[in-house]
Amino acid sequence: MVAKPDLGCRGAGVQLVRDAGKLRSYLSAFPRGARLLLQALVPFEGEAGIFYCRRPGESKGRIISITLKYFPHVYGDGRRTLRQLILDDPRAGRLAHLYLGRHADRLDDVPAPGDAVRLAFAGSHSRGAIFRNGNAMVTPAMEARFDTIAQSLPEFYFGRFDIRFADFAQVQAGQSFTIVEANGAGAESTHIWDRRTTLVQAWGDLMRQYRLLFQIGRANRDRGFRPLSLSEFRRWHRREKELTPLYPATD
């Protein structure tokens, strides 16, 4: 299974739990009084972030962002140890402080030629995952499927579904994927982290996202919903900042 904090971001505290001993270790390291989630492990290698938006009163919503995520790997050559492969890799070497500890029990192993060693479990760019802009891959069937899912959630108008899948063509057909997270108003259109995106493009996409968010917020206020007060927002923000350094190490 997968263990993760209920309150957090960028993959903080996410761990793969393979046995009862690992679960006990995770629970003992978790901050007291904080909530956590235990999820069934989804074995699919593919991961994507699907950002959905619908204004209150609209009959259907749309997908405004797709991010394809690729996990960091090194590949064996039959000569170098895993430690050497990590340190010699132009990208992984810069994040060796993350990977060496996670793979401490196998750093002296020599992977066979062509063997892929996945370096991180969490699909976060802070863990070395590569993000690619997939906005051109939206299909009507995919949009209809996510609209059905979003409209089944009471008052869900804006957010990112993080999914796992085996074949993205099936996702485009609206089939064969598993949602591992639903992120709400604090979510980000993560396609902006594609290295081919310019700073101006990233700013523009974020401003369009936040314009939609504030339009939805205004519509919901007009419908009678009370927004968080500034003090409430600060309290939640402070709580997240206090908890994040206390979570167990991220896989």
Segments (PLM) and residue ranges:
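Coil-to-beta-strand transition motifs
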Residues: 45-47, 56-63, 155-158, 172-177, ...
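Generic detector of well-ordered alpha-helical segments enriched in charged/polar residues
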Residues: 24-28, 143, 147, 204-207, ...
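A long amphipathic alpha-helix within ATP-dependent nucleotide-binding catalytic cores
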Residues: 86-173, 220-247
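Active-site nucleotide/adenylate-binding loops and adjacent lid/helix of ATP-dependent enzymes
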Residues: 1-100, 139-143
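C-terminal active-site "lid" helix and adjoining low-complexity regulatory extension at the edge
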Residues: 166-251
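Short secondary-structure junctions and interdomain/linker hinges
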Residues: 34, 73, 153-160, 189
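Short hydrophobic beta-strand that contains or immediately precedes a catalytic carboxylate
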Residues: 3, 160, 179-181
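A structural signal for short, well-ordered beta-strand segments
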Residues: 50, 66, 163, 182-184
